């Protein structure tokens, strides 16, 4: 790193002597071209030395002096200074006003969209509501009919349930009579012994 700096300083020291040595116009033109070339070489050497020094410094510091990091830090500081300045505050106020205007416009658009959806839904729901109203209007007339149908069904059920009654009653009476016929017979009591003062036997013949 010291070698390019030394060469640059030597060229700068030799440049005034080279410029003052020419006496004629041709010598002055040639010396000016030589001066431009020397200045370009000096600039190239300085840029090379700066790049090498920066690379070594970044490697030794663990990337702290890396160009990307330094550029990001410089841009962040510049932006903070810009927003802190009066023009920056004015721009920030304009941006906030623009954002609020956009929010209001978005809310109005959403409200308009909701209103359109509600209107479309109401128009589509009108036929259904009309049919429902018609159904509700016809339902009072159908209530007596349904009541009569329910009454008829109850009557038929009573008839169906009540029809086996006499048959079952007749069947039970016949069964009772058959039992009585099975146990039918003649019964006689011998009261002669009791009339004589003795204890007679009660004989029952079936």
Curated annotation (Swiss-Prot):
Example GO BP: defense response
PTM sites of type Phosphoserine: 99, 153
One annotated Gene Ontology cellular component of this protein: plasma membrane
Pfam families assigned to the protein according to its UniProt record, in alphabetical order: PTPRCAP
Residue span of region Disordered: 98-173
Oligomeric and partner information: Interacts with CD45/PTPRC.
Keyword list, A-Z: Membrane, Phosphoprotein, Transmembrane, Transmembrane helix
Subcellular location: Membrane
NAD in keyword set: no
Biased composition (Low complexity): 161-173
Principal location: membrane
PANTHER family for the chain: PROTEIN TYROSINE PHOSPHATASE RECEPTOR TYPE C-ASSOCIATED PROTEIN
Free-text description of this protein's post-translational modifications in UniProt: Phosphorylated on tyrosine residues.
The name this protein goes by in its record: Protein tyrosine phosphatase receptor type C-associated protein
Keyword Transmembrane helix among UniProt keywords: yes
Topological relation to the membrane, as annotated: Single-pass membrane protein
Domain of life, per lineage: Eukaryota
Cited InterPro entries: PTPRCAP
Transmembrane annotation, as ranges: 34-54
């Amino acid at each position: 790193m010291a070698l390019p700096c030394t060469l640059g300083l030597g060229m700068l020291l030799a440049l005034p002597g080279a410029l003052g040595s020419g006496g004629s116009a041709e010598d002055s033109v040639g010396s000016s071209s030589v001066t431009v070339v020397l200045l370009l070489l000096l600039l190239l050497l300085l840029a090379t030395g700066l790049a090498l020094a920066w690379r070594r410094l970044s490697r030794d510091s663990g990337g702290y002096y890396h160009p990307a990091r330094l550029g990001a830090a410089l841009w962040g500081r510049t932006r903070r200074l810009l927003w802190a300045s009066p023009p920056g505050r004015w721009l920030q106020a304009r941006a906030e006003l623009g954002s609020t205007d956009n929010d209001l416009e978005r809310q109005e658009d959403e409200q308009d969209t909701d209103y359109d959806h509600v209107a479309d839904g109401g128009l589509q729901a009108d036929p259904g509501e009309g049919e429902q109203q018609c159904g509700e209007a016809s339902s009072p007339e159908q209530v007596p009919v349904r009541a009569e149908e329910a009454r008829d069904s109850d009557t038929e059920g009573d008839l169906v349930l009540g029809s086996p009654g006499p048959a079952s009653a007749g069947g039970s009476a016949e069964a009772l009579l058959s039992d009585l016929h099975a146990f039918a017979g003649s019964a006689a009591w011998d009261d002669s012994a009791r009339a004589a003062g003795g204890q007679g036997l009660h004989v029952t013949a079936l």
